[in-house]
């Protein structure tokens, strides 16, 4: 039996429970029908969320994938009830509470390059600032 070798590693953002075969998946070189079936099954409880996914494709068209947590910017927009952030970071377009920022940091801790909630909170606060979202006590 020939050894499987990795042919491609792709990072794509998909909507939970709504993955469809398309150009983004076609370029990875995997069985798109099988991937979308497995992805939609694993993400049925996260309908409508943007979910980053890392797909590892092998030379025999098989694959593995890892699901990450929703991006911080999406969580901040959801907490501030906004469609999008500011074009200029100096323009304030919304507010979130420090408690909401802590909840986002706690949720994202598993995927962030941080060891403590405080370090993750600093990352969340930096993202909010760049989006024009004010964090209030």
Swiss-Prot record:
GO molecular function: large ribosomal subunit rRNA binding; structural constituent of ribosome
Family annotation (PROSITE patterns): RIBOSOMAL_L11
UniProt KW Ribosomal protein keyword: yes
One Gene Ontology cellular component annotation held by this UniProt entry: cytosolic large ribosomal subunit
Keywords from the UniProt entry: Methylation, Ribonucleoprotein, Ribosomal protein, RNA-binding, rRNA-binding
GO terms (BP aspect): translation
Function: Forms part of the ribosomal stalk which helps the ribosome interact with GTP-bound translation factors.
HAMAP family: Ribosomal_uL11
UniProt cross-references to PANTHER family, sorted A to Z: 60S RIBOSOMAL PROTEIN L12, LARGE RIBOSOMAL SUBUNIT PROTEIN UL11M
Family in the record: Belongs to the universal ribosomal protein uL11 family.
Protein name: Large ribosomal subunit protein uL11
Source species of the chain: Mycoplasma genitalium (strain ATCC 33530 / DSM 19775 / NCTC 10195 / G37) (Mycoplasmoides genitalium)
Protein encoded by which gene: rplK
């Amino acid at each position: 039996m020939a050894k499987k070798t990795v042919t491609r590693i792709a990072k794509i953002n998909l909507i939970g429970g709504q993955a469809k075969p398309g150009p983004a998946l076609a370029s990875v070189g995997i069985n798109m029908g099988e991937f979308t079936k497995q992805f939609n099954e694993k993400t049925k409880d996260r309908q409508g969320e943007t979910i980053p996914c890392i797909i590892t494709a092998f030379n025999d068209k098989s694959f593995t994938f890892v699901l990450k947590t929703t991006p911080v910017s999406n969580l901040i927009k959801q907490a501030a009830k906004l469609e999008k952030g500011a074009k200029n970071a100096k323009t304030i377009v919304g507010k979130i509470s420090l408690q909401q920022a802590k909840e986002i940091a706690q949720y994202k801790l598993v995927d962030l390059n941080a060891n403590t909630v405080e370090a993750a909170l600093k990352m969340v606060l930096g993202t909010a600032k760049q989006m024009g979202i004010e964090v209030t006590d």
